[in-house]
Regions:
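Flexible inter-repeat linkers and adjacent short helices
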Residues: 1-30
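Amphipathic alpha-helical segments of tetratricopeptide repeats
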Residues: 2, 36-47, 54-55, 91-102, ...
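"A position-specific structural signal for the A-helix of alpha-solenoid helical repeats
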Residues: 11-17, 65-72, 110, 116-117, ...
Length: 208
């Protein structure tokens, strides 16, 4: 049962912010602002000491709720065109999870979501080879964990980056037939899962 303590308020503010964003009631910049407000309910010094939390030598024991907010915040920074901040936040919370400060059945799945945020940040910064390498790692782990949604997201992102690298290089570094084969894999997995958004996205890109 949700009460009026800080942890519950933090949970509600995060949930409402995500819902408003996905229902197109707020823009990405507002999502960042609201998520940071939720975070500061427990990390009251975030504005002043965020660089301390994100420093390479620090591993801070964030709570599960803080990690979820930070994970969403990383995605939000990507959405509003600040991939550098997204990368810093993703690396920060991955250090916390890798140090096993938080253990739950969902920890490994959470890591994959965070790593994908990191890969998307690399994409936004035009570091396509870095993104591709990370996505291939994510795909292997997602298959092992039987994390179906992440399998299709990683596969789709892999094809996107391969295609982008080919376009920029002006040569076929990655075989086009292999890219199309991977796109078909994504399409059929998405169709089997009833994920029309991904299925339509792939169908559109396949026709290009």
């Amino acid at each position: 049962q949700i009460g009026d303590n800080i942890i519950d308020l933090q949970y509600v503010l995060r949930a409402e912010t995500l819902l408003d964003y996905y229902n197109h009631k707020i823009v990405a910049e507002t999502m960042v602002k609201n998520l940071e407000e939720a975070l500061k309910l427990t990390l009251v010094d975030w504005d002043i000491h965020s660089n301390f939390y994100m420093s390479e030598n620090e591993v801070y024991p964030f709570t599960e709720q803080e990690i979820l907010i930070l994970m969403n915040l990383s995605g939000a920074y990507n959405e509003c065109g600040n991939p550098e901040m997204s990368e810093k936040i993703s690396n920060m919370i991955l250090k916390c999870l890798n140090a096993e400060y938080l253990k739950s059945d969902e920890t490994e799945n959470l890591k994959l979501v965070i790593k994908r945020n990191l890969a998307l940040a690399c994409q936004h910064m035009k570091r396509y080879e870095d993104a591709l390498s990370l996505l291939q790692e994510i795909l292997k782990q997602a298959i092992t964990l039987k994390y179906g949604l992440m399998v299709i997201l990683a596969l789709y992102d892999i094809t996107w980056n391969m295609q982008k690298i080919n376009e920029i290089s002006g040569c076929e570094k990655y075989n086009w037939n292999e890219i199309k084969k991977k796109k078909l894999q994504v399409y059929y997995i998405a169709a089997a899962r009833g994920d029309n958004y991904i299925k339509n996205l792939v169908a559109k890109s396949y026709r290009k």
